[in-house]
Regions:
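Anion-binding and metal-coordination hotspots
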Residues: 1-246
């Protein structure tokens, strides 16, 4: 069997709600239609722990995050998921107990950071996730240290997306919150199409809001919302800003 078939078997086993360890995978597949799940000639005994172990090592060497993203994009293409708009965000997960970080050089650091769970008393890990606007399909997933800052995470992701987005003929947009828009990150995002919220820490933000309130030249949007568009250059990037009124 191939590495891909071994990984597929582990996923199917995990979805079987049997809570069986991996070394019992052959037992899990004993009464399953192997030819339908895989192909003719594949037998349950092929998924022994030696093959599964070698497959996990191969995935690790290739890069788990990279492999996940590549498979997710292929799946989206097959199902005709619209990938023009890609929403990027992070979540924090609070943890308890002791963790031995010395056991794995590649392990993330479980430590204190900005808690989105509102539990600053607990250590945490951070998960970065980018999903398609169409259906919310995850296409990027990466774990980070518990004290990783969104500004840094967004910068690195934007940098990695430049070439990927340019390979595609039609425009693709990175959608993220205000942590994407910093002077440091502007050197990267100027190479992308992006949609973000302008941070309130910028002095220009309240000035422009007051300006459009004075002008009152609103355009109707929907459900009681109105907007005014402002064309300007900022951080060396020609941009279109919208002020939304509700």
């Amino acid at each position: 069997i191939t590495t891909g078939e071994a990984v597929a078997a582990m996923i199917i086993n995990g979805l079987g709600f049997s809570n069986r360890p991996l070394y019992l995978t052959p037992q899990f597949f004993e009464n399953k239609p192997m030819a339908l799940l895989f192909r003719e000639g594949v037998e349950a005994q092929h998924f022994n722990r030696s093959k599964l172990g070698r497959s996990l090592e191969a995935v690790y060497r290739y890069g788990v995050d990279q492999l996940f993203s590549e498979i997710a994009v292929i799946g989206c293409q097959q199902e005709q998921i619209d990938l023009r708009f890609n929403s990027l965000d992070t979540s924090s997960f609070s943890l308890t107990g002791a963790y031995d970080s010395e056991t794995d050089e590649q392990a993330i650091k479980i430590t204190y950071g900005h808690s989105k769970d509102h539990r600053p008393d607990l250590k945490q890990a951070v998960l970065e996730l980018m999903v398609s606007q169409d259906g919310g399909v995850p296409i990027v997933s990466q774990a980070w240290d518990g004290n990783a800052a969104d500004t840094v995470i967004f910068k690195q992701r934007a940098e990695s997306l430049i070439n990927e987005f340019k390979k595609i003929g039609s425009p693709r947009y990175l959608v993220a919150d205000s942590k994407l828009y910093t002077e440091e990150n502007s050197k990267i995002i100027k190479e992308l199409f992006y949609i973000t919220r302008i941070p309130g820490t910028l002095k220009l933000e309240p000035q422009l809001i007051q300006q459009v309130l004075d002008e009152a030249d609103w355009q109707p949007l929907n459900d009681g919302y109105r907007y005014q568009r402002i064309e300007l250059g900022h951080y060396g990037i020609d941009q279109r800003w919208l002020v939304i009124y509700s």
